[in-house]
Each structure stands twice: as C-alpha cells, then as structure tokens.
Design a protein with these regions (language model features):
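Short alpha-helix in the alpha/beta-hydrolase fold that links the catalytic acid
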Residues: 297, 311-321
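Conserved alpha/beta-hydrolase
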Residues: 116-118, 123-147
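Active-site glycine-rich loops that stabilize anionic/oxyanionic intermediates
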Residues: 111-114
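Alpha/beta-hydrolase active-site loop
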Residues: 153-173
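Short beta-strand/loop motif that positions the catalytic acidic residue
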Residues: 295, 301-303
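Alpha/beta-hydrolase-fold enzymes
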Residues: 183, 187-275
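N-terminal cap/lid segment of alpha/beta-hydrolase-fold proteins
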Residues: 67-93
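Catalytic active-site module of serine/aspartate enzymes centered on a nucleophile-bearing elbow/loop
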Residues: 333-392, 396-397, 401
Length: 401
C-alpha cells in the first residue's frame, strides 16, 4: 500500500521529450560571402561590425578595382631600407646584373594601404624597358607590417618623412651614379613631397595623386565616400586601434594614424594635423609645406576622368604645393583609349600595357609627352623666366605700336 501511494503521488513522466535544436538563421540578401569569425571575442566582435558595415552601408569597392595584377614574370629580390627612426622598410628590387651609370632606377610609391605586390607587373615592365625598379611597403602595410597593428603608430607623415625618404636614400646609395625617378600612385604623390631626399629625383610621374579632401571627391560619389572614409573608417580605428579594412574588402588593414590622416583632411594638407593624436606643432606644419618646395623635378600628373578620388580639383589641390616643379597635368578619359573604365586603380593593370604604360615610360625617359599621347592637357609648365621676359617685352612693344 505504501509503495502504491508513493507512486500515485509521483509526478507523471513524459512519454516523449523533443531534443533541443538551435534555431537556423539564414543570411538572406547578403551581397558578399559570410566572413569566418575568429575564435576570440575580439575577433567575433570585429567580424560582426565589419560585416554589418559592408552590408548596410554598401561601402565595399568593386571587385575588379583591387584585384592583384597577374603574377610578375621576373623574380624580384627583397631589400630592407632602415628609416631614420630605425624601422625596417621592406620591399622588392628589380636590378640588372651589368652596372650602368646612366641606367635609371625607378621608385614606386604605393597608394594608401595597397601592397607593393600590386605594382609588380608594372615594375617588371619598366625593368624590361631598361630601368632598375624598387617597390616597397609603407610601415604597417604588407612586407612592412608588424605582428600587431593595434596600437601601432603610423601616419601619412611617417610614410613620407621616414619611409619614402629611406627608400630614396637606399636607391641613391645602392645605385650610385644612376638617376632616380619616382612613380607615385594616389597618396604616393603626397609622401614624395614630404621626403627630405626628394631633391635627388630626376623626374616624377603621379597617377590619381591627391590627399583626399572630401569636397574634391567626384560629385556622384561624394556622400557615399564621405560616409565610408570620413565617418566609418575613423570609427573602426577608434574601436579596434586600427582599421580592419581587409575583412571589409576595402584595402589592407590600416594603422589608426593613417586613418586619421585621411579622415581629417582639410582644404590645406597641413591643417589635418592640428589635433591629437596626430598633432604637429605650428613650426612642424610650416615645415611640411616647405618640404614640397624642395622637389624641382619635372612632374607629369595623370588624372583619369572616371577616378572618383582624382578629380581635377583634387589633383590640382596637391599640385599647388609643388611650386618649384614644372608640372604637366594630363587628363585621360576611358573612351579615349577604347575602354569602358579605368578608375583609381586600374592604370597599373597589365591590360593597359599597350595604351597607358607607354605614356609613363615615355615621360620617365624623355620628360615630355609624345604628340600622339591620348587625353587632354589641363595644365602645362609655365614658360621659363628668360622666355617669359622676352615674351612680355615683345608684347609691350606691340602694345606701344
């Protein structure tokens, strides 16, 4: 009886218990493949924020913009150029075996957070045309990246005053007696002006060079680019201590100071450096401007009509700092070479080896544009002072008559 009473008081047992299952979550409408999360809390947080930014802000670059060109045909040799602060700036060199004092050595300055390997095909082309070539990565990028970018200090100023200067000195030292030329892409045209050794440059060529003042962006892209580069990018830099740009498909991961250099750009380049943590003293900011005036090499600035960064206003804003260089500003539209688009990056794609690259090669060899060069010259160098005086005198005589 007692046993029956106990059984009668016991709670009824379930005949069947459904196993628990995790809810299935589908990612619908994602324009990009899901990002694999890191096995850490910080990594998961970064991936979640980056994925959310890419999907909701629609701020990833077009896929064909940042694809690396085909692998290089010639194996370059790695080199290290120690900067003035001791940082090892790393890159690759194409060197001819037979020494020749008259052979030029061309230094290639990269765009912001674009690896130097992106320019390998163009470097191999210049090498095949008789030039020695050096390509390198700025500190924090590619071959010059430290183990961790979180807390790593680097700005555009460091890339110019330290890294570019170190490579120019390395070129002069290891290629003694050879003329030094520079090809500069995007911000590479800025860091050239900041390098104290820029007086050694014989000729300079820039492609889409500017310092990213947002009002100069192409009108149809301006608001989107403002949100991406001047709002989202500094926010990511503040959260993570650097910009995890590679996971977003933008570019290489970027040091915080570089992101601030970019996002704080003002009409005057030096005015981006008035607030911490990238603040420069008033004397140092005046020195920045003076450094650009040391470059006396003739410069060809190439701008592409469909480059949302390199508008006429943006390129001219930077060229205004090179007051002692004879500057030629050439504008090229895609239809003038029979293609649909070129944009900010594609100049260095090997598909333009027969159309755009000969323009660069001709300028580096002769310092002049060939008569058949496509495009429109927006600005030509001013007449030399003696010729200008003679012209003014002749016009004065004509007016007197």
């Amino acid at each position: 009886m007692r046993m029956r009473a106990r059984r009668a008081c016991a709670p009824p047992q379930r005949q069947f218990q459904r196993p628990r299952r995790r809810p299935l979550r589908l990612r619908i409408g994602a324009a990009r493949p899901p990002i694999r999360s890191r096995p850490t809390r910080e990594g998961n947080r970064a991936d979640a924020l980056c994925d959310r930014a890419a999907r909701h802000l629609d701020i990833t670059m077009r896929g064909d913009d940042m694809q690396d060109p085909q692998p290089d045909a010639l194996p370059p040799e790695p080199f290290v150029a120690p900067a003035a602060d001791g940082f090892p700036v790393r890159g690759f060199a194409w060197r001819h075996r037979a020494p020749a004092a008259g052979r030029p050595v061309t230094v290639i300055n990269c765009a912001t957070s674009v690896r130097c390997r992106y320019y390998f095909r163009f470097a191999a082309y210049l090498f095949s045309q008789g030039s020695d070539v050096l390509v390198y990565d700025y500190r924090g990028i590619g071959e010059s990246r430290p183990a961790s970018l979180a807390g790593f200090h680097a700005t555009w100023l460091d890339w110019g005053r330290l890294d570019c200067d170190a490579v120019l000195q390395y070129a002069a030292r290891t290629c003694a007696g050879q003329p030094v030329d520079v090809v500069a892409h995007s911000v590479g045209g800025v860091v050239l002006g900041l390098a104290a050794s820029n007086p050694i440059v014989r000729r300079a060529l820039t492609v889409g060079a500017q310092y990213a003042y947002w009002r100069d962006y192409a009108g149809s892209h301006r608001l989107r680019m403002l949100a991406k580069w001047h709002v989202a990018m500094p926010m990511l830099a503040r959260v993570f201590g650097y910009v995890p740009a590679k996971r977003l498909g933008w570019m290489e991961d970027t040091p915080r100071g570089v992101a601030l250099s970019w996002s704080r750009s003002r009409p005057r380049f030096e005015d981006a450096y008035v607030r911490a943590p990238i603040r420069e003293t008033p004397d140092a900011r005046r020195d920045l401007v003076e450094r650009f005036t040391r470059l006396t090499a003739p410069m060809l600035a190439i701008g592409l009509s469909d480059d949302e960064f390199g508008s006429v206003e943006a390129v001219e804003r930077l060229l205004g700092y090179y007051t002692r260089s004879a500057v030629t500003h050439l504008r090229i539209a895609p239809e003038q070479i029979g293609v649909a688009s070129i944009g900010h990056f594609a100049f260095f794609h090997s598909r333009f080896e027969q159309t755009l690259w000969p323009i660069a090669l001709g300028w580096l060899k002769t310092g002049a544009l060939a008569p058949e060069t496509p495009g429109r010259v927006h600005r030509q160098p001013c007449a030399p002072e003696p010729a200008r005086a003679a012209r003014d005198e002749a016009s004065g005589r004509t007016a007197a008559r």
